[in-house]
UniProtKB/Swiss-Prot annotation:
Gene3D superfamilies: 6.10.250.1760, Chloramphenicol acetyltransferase-like domain, Choline/Carnitine o-acyltransferase, domain 2. Catalyzes the transfer of the acyl group of long-chain fatty acid-CoA conjugates onto carnitine, an essential step for the mitochondrial uptake of long-chain fatty acids and their subsequent beta-oxidation in the mitochondrion. This is Carnitine O-palmitoyltransferase 1, muscle isoform. The lineage of its organism: Eukaryota, Metazoa, Chordata, Craniata, Vertebrata. Belongs to the carnitine/choline acetyltransferase family. It is found in: Mitochondrion outer membrane. It is a multi-pass membrane protein. Its main location: mitochondrion. Residues 74-101 are mitochondrial intermembrane. The active site is at residue 472.
Length: 771
């Protein structure tokens, strides 16, 4: 389609007089504008680096200190206690210090700058110390202590005004290393009710032997690492949990995010995509300029923002032993897949970001292009869905030179990947299966219409519905959720559409069309592609996904029960699982540790002794409501306490994981660690964050709700459950399992979740919403 329009900076022809160069003014103009844009970005980064480096100080505060020093000198008050005079003596003779007056001014400026820098250092260290206090998390709602109130005032005073995205990074405390006895004790407490007496005695013996003999040496190395590393967990977690995994990342690692499902802005596929891509690049520009406000817990405690750095221009590159994340400082295009063809779409005209209407025109050109796929091109992306070793070998053998390398570079160096699907998906409340089919399309598609290695793939369906498929190694779900909230809010409330559903404005018809990527894929490579496709297809076909909207109530009713919404849902999941399987199991709930620098996640083992006691009492059906309420509140309090411990660095699993990594480096065998890390998570759960950005008033626009997202089951005979408490009156659930397991059924478990929520709510006899 676009071969004839490929831009070249110059052409040359051989004549009798020699070689005649013909420079293209248009291309040189674009090169010039590109250089200008690149330098502008560098200058912005330098400026932001300086402002970030002196935060919470500012040029204004520096000027105040200088003026205070000069003013005191005017009134013959030496607040420097002779230091200004001492500095003046050491200034070299001659220019620019020729007169005593200029020497004095320079001395005052140097002294003031030193005082200013010392103040910044003091404020930062004090703020870091204050942010290490987590007592506020363990206080009952509405019962704030005097200590916490004083702490909050101090944090607010030291946090400065108008912080940039990364302003607090150096003030965040490091993730603390828990003590081995505390971790072992909490671990044994988490499994005691899941094991019989003989199994528990055996595990207790292994734990005691580990604690006394093996752990002290491992702990010393781990503490040593925590001293010099920014975070003692995150780099190993990224490498060993994600990048060293050799299994396919589709279903096993990548997750999906859904669009708004109760409102629709347009049915025009290219228009919706044009607005979304424009909003994403606008977000990237804000990200580069650090104009995005850091996420603050309670509007007071900053969360770590480092994961956002690799949101765009990032690709997971396969390797034989381990993958690597390739992140580029900038990218001016997106890669697009449609009907088996790959395209390169430029996002800028010179230094100007294309308007939504221009982007709509470019995507419509791709939709209208009738050209067929090249041999081997249609299913090429299946390589990213198959085994990692096979992909690494194929990449080295067939994509390391020539046009294949150039085309692959265009994809891997893109800002992100776009999939233009030919089918339609949406949520129809009257059709229960519609949400599940939508989720399946986002999770794996047809296994070759997503580039699973990109940081994220933006998926556009024929009816204008959108969604994301996200690679997991570079960041966790709240990070991509932050971007998605911005995109959906910008699309609905800032960009808008015409009455006919197109983007606002007029397109620029002289824009060169998208560039078709060229491939030369030999038969041997096509065989590898087909093999990877069959592997991925078997995985995808085995996934049973059941997504549903729970309408009877949401967090509004749960709050009336005077309990945490997350604890309420987690206990309901335990009740549902016991009814479904007739037994309890290790349960994984993801929590975050972003109150610490470069923190990612920690595990909450939410199947507790207290929750099992409540479930057993519910199932027996012989207890009074008052007794059941008491057991429920006890279970909810235990869950909340465990969640708080995980968030404040006192979790179990990341500590044991790191001790295991140290043991492998040292060649030390630990039966206890080997057994703990091989235990299957048959119920893996996660709550989806929302309203991280206030783009609109949810009370005024209650139907502007996304349905969250989901992931595949972690264990072959287990369930994966994600949920989003989407408002006062609704909860979305995404339940996954495998068809190949005779013990699990996603829809059956989803129905058990529904009933468990209703049964627990009935204990409190609180009226439910209609629906």
């Amino acid at each position: 389609m676009a071969e004839a329009h490929q831009a070249v900076a110059f052409q040359f022809t051989v004549t009798p007089e020699g070689v005649d160069f013909q420079l293209s003014r248009e291309v040189l103009k674009h090169i010039y504008l590109s250089v200008i844009r690149s330098w502008k970005k560098r200058l912005i980064r330098i400026k932001n680096g300086i402002l970030r480096g002196v935060y919470p100080g500012s040029p204004t505060s520096w000027l105040v200190v200088v003026m205070a020093t000069a003013g005191s000198s005017y009134y013959n008050v030496d607040i420097s206690m002779g230091l200004v005079y001492y500095i003046q003596r050491w200034l070299p003779e001659g220019r620019p210090y020729r007169t005593p007056y200029t020497r004095t001014l320079f001395s005052m400026a140097i002294f003031s700058t030193g005082v200013w820098m010392m103040g910044i250092f003091f404020f930062r260290q004090t703020l870091k110390l204050l942010l290490s206090y987590h007592g506020w998390m363990f206080e009952l709602h509405g019962q704030t202590s005097h200590l916490t109130r004083v702490w909050a005032v101090c944090v607010r005073l030291l946090s400065g005004r108008r912080p940039m995205l990364y302003s607090f990074q150096t003030s965040l405390p490091k993730l603390p290393v828990p003590s081995v006895p505390a971790t072992v004790h909490r671990y044994l407490e988490s499994v005691e009710h899941l094991l019989d007496d003989e199994q528990y005695y055996r595990m207790e013996t292994l734990a005691k032997e580990f604690e006394e003999k093996t752990a002290p040496r491992l702990q010393k190395y781990l503490v040593l690492k925590s001293w010099w590393a920014t975070n003692y967990v995150s780099d190993w977690w990224e490498e060993y949990v994600y990048l060293r995994g050799r299994n396919p990342i589709v279903v096993n690692s990548n997750y999906y995010v859904m669009d708004l499902v109760l409102v629709k802005n347009t049915d025009v596929q290219a228009a919706r995509l044009g607005n979304a891509v424009h909003a994403m690049i606008t977000y990237r520009r804000k990200l580069d300029r650090e104009e995005i406000k850091p996420v603050m817990a309670l509007g007071l405690v900053p969360m770590c923002s480092y994961q956002m750095e690799r949101m765009f221009n990032t690709t997971r590159i396969p390797g034989k032993d381990t993958d690597v994340l390739q992140h580029l400082p900038d990218s001016r295009h997106v890669a697009v897949y449609h009907k088996g063809r790959f395209f390169k779409v430029w996002l800028y005209e010179g230094s100007r970001l294309l308007k939504p209407r221009d982007l709509e025109m470019q995507f419509q050109r791709i939709l209208d292009d009738p050209s067929p796929p090249q041999p081997g091109e249609e299913r090429l992306a299946a390589l990213t869905a198959g085994g990692r070793v096979e992909w690494a070998q194929a990449r080295q053998a067939f994509f390391s030179s020539g046009k294949n390398k150039a085309a692959l570079d265009a994809i891997e160096r893109a800002a992100f990947f776009v999939a233009l699907d030919e089918e339609s998906h949406h949520y129809d409340p009257e059709d229960e299966a519609s949400l599940s089919l939508y989720g399946k399309a986002l999770l794996h598609g047809n296994c070759y219409n997503r580039w699973f290695d990109k940081s994220f793939t933006l998926i556009s369906f024929k009816n204008g519905q959108l969604g994301l498929n996200t690679e997991h190694a570079w960041a966790d779900a709240p990070i991509i959720g932050h971007l998605w909230e911005f995109v959906l809010g910008t699309d609905s409330f800032h960009l808008g559409y015409t009455e006919t559903g197109h983007c606002l404005g007029k397109p620029n018809p002289v824009l060169p069309p998208p560039q078709r990527l060229q491939w030369d894929i030999p038969k041997q490579c096509q065989a590898v592609i087909e093999s990877s496709y069959q592997v991925a297809k078997a995985l995808a076909d085995d996934v049973e996904l059941y997504c549903f909207q729970f309408l009877p109530f949401g967090k509004g009713l749960i709050k009336k029960c005077r309990t945490s919404p997350d604890a309420f849902v987690q206990i309901a999941l335990q009740l549902a699982h016991f009814r479904d399987r007739g037994k309890f199991c290790l349960t994984y709930e993801a929590s975050m540790t972003r109150m610490f620098r470069e923190g990612r996640t920690e595990t909450v083992r939410s199947c507790t002794r207290e929750s099992t006691a409540f479930v057993q009492a519910m199932v027996q059906g012989r207890h009074l409501n008052e007794d059941l309420q008491r057991l429920f509140r006890k279970a909810a309090e235990k869950h909340q306490n465990m969640y708080r411990l995980a968030m404040t660095g006192a979790g179990i699993d990341r500590h044991l994981f790191c001790l295991y990594v140290v043991s492998k480096y040292l060649g030390v065998e630990s039966p206890f660690l080997a057994e703990v890390l091989s235990e299957p998570w048959r119920l893996s759960t996660s709550q989806i964050a929302q309203f991280q950005i206030r783009m609109f008033d949810p009370n005024k626009y209650p139907k502007h709700l996304g349905a969250g997202g989901g992931f595949g089951p972690v264990a072959d005979d287990g369930y994966g459950v994600s949920y989003m408490i989407a408002g006062e009156n609704t909860i979305f659930f995404h339940v996954s399992s495998k068809f190949s397991s005779s013990e699990t059924n996603a829809q059956r478990f989803g129905n058990q979740i529904r009933q468990a929520l209703l049964d627990i709510a009935n204990l409190f006899q609180v009226p439910k919403a209609d629906g």
